[in-house]
Amino acid sequence: MIEKRRYFHENPEMTGKEYKTIEYLSAELTALGIEHVVIENGGILATIKGGKDGRAVLLRADVDGLPVQETPDNLKPGMRTCISKNPGVMHACGHDGHMAMLLGAAKILLDKKDEIAGTVYLCFERGEEASGNVEYIFPYIEKNNIQIDTVYGTHLLATAPSGYLAINDGGMMAGAMGFNITIEGAGGHGSRPDQANSPIDCCFVAIYQRLQALRLTKVDPFKTCTYSVGVLQSGNQGNVIPQTLTFGGTMRTFDRDGVGVTFYNELKKAVDGICAAYDCKATYNSYGMPGYAVVNDEEMAQWARKVLAEELGSENVGQWEPWMASESYNQYLQQWPGVFAFLGIQNEEKGIGAAHHNQEFDIDEDVLYKGAAAAATYAIEYLKDDSVKGGRKMTYKQYLEKVANYKLLTKHYGE
């Protein structure tokens, strides 16, 4: 697994461009004798059929890298075991480890194939960082009548101690909403702002002030909500009043239907109203409804902790504070009962502990076997125990209707 992880880490590919990564994964699965299909734009879905008939489990890993220039060292000089060979692209979130662990789980499952009472699907998902490519996987599953009873996924976590597996009774990762908006006023000479209509001076300043006030005036103080502006672009010369200003950011919450929808409505109302007041025009380049948080099924989480504690030791399995980052895996848990797990990688002696998406990010390779063992154990034990819940909660079409993502609904179902 360590060898595989190092290959993935040295050869990261950006979201939506993971062509060589998919080729490599396909070759590895072929070498193992595992049947699989490459889903165009979606990733890979592999199938391991057990020695007995039964239910089905889907195990998932994401595969894409990030536009980050990796530093030669992690938090401790000389401790990196490998580094990206692709300038400006890095596995800075642990997806290299996720792939390696799922391949490791595949080998464990093959070794125990005769005792598997059902089917295990391995899903290697492209484009998780943009949450876009998974939209090709679910329609494939439905159109091919693939029956799944439960899902399991793992994310390496830099804030948890190395080797600690966390499965919460509920929230694991927040839901997200992204926004990117252009404000158009009227440009002019920097010496005569009275003859121009700067999108900066009044319009954006007022929008930003309103944005800061939303948390105080519209968000329940007992609900989690965080947001920030990460993009602000306008003008390129000091004596020219620009015509346009573009700003963008993100909002995160565990209360999508309450806080999330409120934020969506209130920010748009503020932008529209303030632009009208200052005679500016707003263009919503990106403004989608917020996604759902990654929330474990409580019954499944308690069952999973029990069986995985027997495999890994009770001292190594428990719960951990939720993470405000977001994950496309929420879409799996909306459709099927299951769990999402954190596997800690923090190791001060090895210089490992930098935040995800940071240029000094690194993972503790010595924990990969635990992630593989946990995934394989979840699948094997679930298929042994018919008393544990399973089955589809909703179709993908129903999920899209639930999140009001009509663009994707039309794309895949022609409505």
Regions found by a protein language model. Name each.
Residues 202-415:
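Metal-dependent amide/peptide-bond hydrolase catalytic core
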Residues 15-20, 96, 198, 295-298, ...:
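Soluble non-cytosolic domains of exported or imported proteins
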Residues 68-80, 170-174, 348-355:
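Short, flexible, mixed-charge acidic loops at enzyme active sites
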Residues 13, 62-64, 127, 157, ...:
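Active-site beta-loop-alpha junctions enriched in small/polar residues
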